[in-house]
Design a protein with these regions (language model features):
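Core subunits and conserved enzymes of cellular information-processing
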Residues: 1-238
Length: 238
């Protein structure tokens, strides 16, 4: 009887896997990097404030203006990668590839900043830009968490920290975002004399994005199966 139940369960899983559409993890990661880098710059351009994951590099770029936002971004990501290795208490080669992905992400930020001013700035457009950027970032992070490849360190950090601590990803993500915002607020107020880069959109994103990413991820899990050269099985979702 037990063997019969196990066979039925395995058969059901195989049928479910066949019904899922297969997506290459490499393509998912490429899309995630492209739309996340654009989403971060578009959110800042909307005037609603920068996304929480890029708020700390933004603060450094405003205080130390000789270094671009993109450069500060991958420097910050390097710190996150090092922190994860310390928490793991071992060298993790995949984290180095994650840093390379983060470097590309940082360079794309500078590329988008160079042309974003061509977009018209009206109040309706600002609202539209924020909505689009919010959705793009959520989709990008959900894709990153499922691509089966090392991902951008700012996306990797909360996912790995959730795995290390055993806490829920959505809770870790919200806490990470809020801490980033607190650091940004402290730096800009102390060095610039005023709050810079943070707006109502930033606060809204920080407190809701983790939940929205989780919801989008569940939607993907019911329809898509991600495979890559590193992880032939579906990456563990968050």
């Amino acid at each position: 009887y037990t063997l019969l139940i196990n066979d039925l369960h395995q058969t059901a899983q195989e049928i479910q896997q066949k019904e899922l559409h297969t997506v290459r993890g490499e393509l998912a990661l490429l899309v995630a990097v492209l739309i996340n880098s654009f989403g971060v710059v578009l959110m800042l351009y909307s005037g609603a404030g920068i996304s929480a994951i890029s708020s700390v590099p933004f603060a450094f770029s405003e205080v130390f203006t000789r270094i671009s936002l993109g450069t500060w971004t991958y420097l910050f990501q390097g710190v996150l990668v090092l922190s994860l290795m310390i928490l793991r208490k071992r060298f993790v080669p995949q984290y180095l590839f994650s840093f390379v992905v983060g470097f590309v992400f940082g360079e794309l930020l500078d590329v988008h900043e160079a042309w974003i001013n061509l977009l018209p700035l009206t109040l309706p457009n600002r609202i539209l830009y924020f909505a689009i950027s919010y959705l793009l970032i959520c989709i990008g992070i959900a894709l990153s968490n499922r691509c089966g490849l090392p991902i951008i360190p700012t996306d990797l950090f909360p996912r790995e920290l959730a795995d290390i601590t055993g806490a829920a990803y959505s809770n870790i993500k919200v806490s990470f975002d809020v801490i980033c915002l607190a650091v940004t607020a402290g730096m800009t107020i102390f060095f610039l004399g005023h709050l810079d880069g943070l707006g109502i959109g930033t606060i809204l994103a920080a407190f809701t994005m983790g939940k929205v990413i989780g919801a989008i991820g569940k939607w993907m899990d019911g329809r898509l199966r991600f495979v890559s050269v590193l992880t032939p099985k579906t990456a563990k979702p968050c």
